[in-house]
């Protein structure tokens, strides 16, 4: 059908990067920012004993740097691709798909957690977050994002948000 998987798309993009991790981290402050209220989400999940996992196709070492700088590295787990430098270019190896019917590592994790009987809250913004959001128990989409448009079009229940404090309030109401 002329389609490529999420993992293949990201892997191709990473192969185009010729800079080292060191060079990329040197530009960290110019390009990395956090959405308002993320610290409140971390505090809320820690206080309530809710595991928090970042599931991302982004550069793992940048996510780790973000967590380290904010003192969250030990509080948040990662489900991301592993980066390797091959012939001066970045290569990414994503977690293997283990669940029947999964389309990418994002919904694969949600399906696995659901099979284990866990309640899954999913927060996303992109096209490749859709199947994971649809499979979750409670879905959140960044206001105006591709994920919000897809959920609306496909009538998948979700809550739109701009600030993570809104997510915290909604989860707190859901949990009672």
Regions found by a protein language model. Name each.
Residues 85-92, 149-157, 168-173:
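Short, charged, surface-exposed secondary-structure boundary motifs
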């Amino acid at each position: 059908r002329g389609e490529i998987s999420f993992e293949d798309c990201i892997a191709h993009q990473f192969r185009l990067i010729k800079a080292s991790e060191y060079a990329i981290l040197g530009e960290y402050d110019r390009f990395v920012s956090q959405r308002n209220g993320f610290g409140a989400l971390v505090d809320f999940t820690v206080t309530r004993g809710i595991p928090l996992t970042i599931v991302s196709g982004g550069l793992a070492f940048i996510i780790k740097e973000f967590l380290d700088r904010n003192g969250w590295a030990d509080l948040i787990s990662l489900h991301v691709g592993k980066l390797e430098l091959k012939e001066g270019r970045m290569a990414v190896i994503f977690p293997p798909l283990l669940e029947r019917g999964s389309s990418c590592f994002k919904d694969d994790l949600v399906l696995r957690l659901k099979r284990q009987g866990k309640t899954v809250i999913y927060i996303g913004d992109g096209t490749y977050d859709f199947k994971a959001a649809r499979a979750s128990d409670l879905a959140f989409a960044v206001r105006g994002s591709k994920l919000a448009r897809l959920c609306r079009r496909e009538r998948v229940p979700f809550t739109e948000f701009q600030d993570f404090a809104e997510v915290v309030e909604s989860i707190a109401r859901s949990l009672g």
